Amino acid sequence: MVPRKDYEEAIEFLKENKINYKEIEYKPLEIKEFKENRKDRCYYCKKKLMSGIKEEANKNGFKNVLDGKNEDDLKVYRPGNKATEEIGIISPLAEIGFSKENIREESKKLGLKIWNKPSNSCLATRFPYNTILTEDDLKRVEQGEEVLKKLGIPKVRIRVHQEIARIEVEREYSNVIIQNQNIVEQIKALGFRYVTLDLNGLTSGSFDK
C-alpha cells in the first residue's frame, strides 16, 4: 500500500538495472484485519503478501526468498516481522546488523541513484488504529502528500483525524507550509475541512506513541 509514484520509481529502477521481475496482483483491502486498520494489521498483510511471493518463487524453482528488513526495523514496532519469520523469509541485512544509514552508504558507493531516496511507509499508517480504510481515503492522503513533495519537501506525512489533515514535516520545512496558503486550499479540495501543521515535526510511527 505505497504511493503510485514509489511503485513507478521501483519499476524504473528494475528496468534501468536490467533486473528481471514479475508483478503479482495483491489487494490488501480485501484482508479484513488490514481494512479495519487493527494495530497488528501489518502481521496479516505481510503474511499474505510474503506467502504469495514465496509460493510464486517456489513455483519458479527458487528455494529462498529474501527481504530488505534492516537492523533499524528490529528496534521499532513491526508486527510484520513476526509474519516473515513464520514464513521463513530471510533478512540478510538485518542479520549482519546493517542499518538504514549503512544501506545508504553502500548504495552510494555502488552508484545507485536512489541511495538517498527518503524513506516512506504504508499509507495505512496515516490513520488512527481501528479506522476503516477505503481506497478513496488512502488516495486523498497520497494526493495531499504529493502536493507537498512538489514544493521540495522530501519527507511528508498527512495524518488523518476524520475531517482534519494533520501535516507532519521535518521542522526545517515548517515555514514552507506556513508561508504557502495555497497548500491549505489544495488539501481542502481533497475533502478535508481543516488543515493543520504538527509542531512536533515529523514523527515515525506517530499513532504508536
Task: Put a short name on every predicted segment.
Residues 42, 85-86, 134-136, 176:
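Short alpha-helix boundary/capping motifs
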Residues 94, 98-100, 104-148, 155-156:
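Mid-to-C-terminal catalytic subdomains of enzymes
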Residues 26, 69, 118-119, 160, ...:
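Proline- and acidic/polar-enriched loop/turn elements at helix boundaries
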Residues 142-209:
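Peripheral terminal appendages
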Residues 36, 117, 177-178:
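Non-catalytic, surface-exposed connector residues within folded enzymatic/regulatory domains
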Residues 34-37, 77-80, 127-130, 168-170, ...:
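Short secondary-structure transition/capping segments
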Residues 1-109, 150, 165, 181-192, ...:
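ATP-dependent adenylation/nucleotidyltransferase module used to activate substrates
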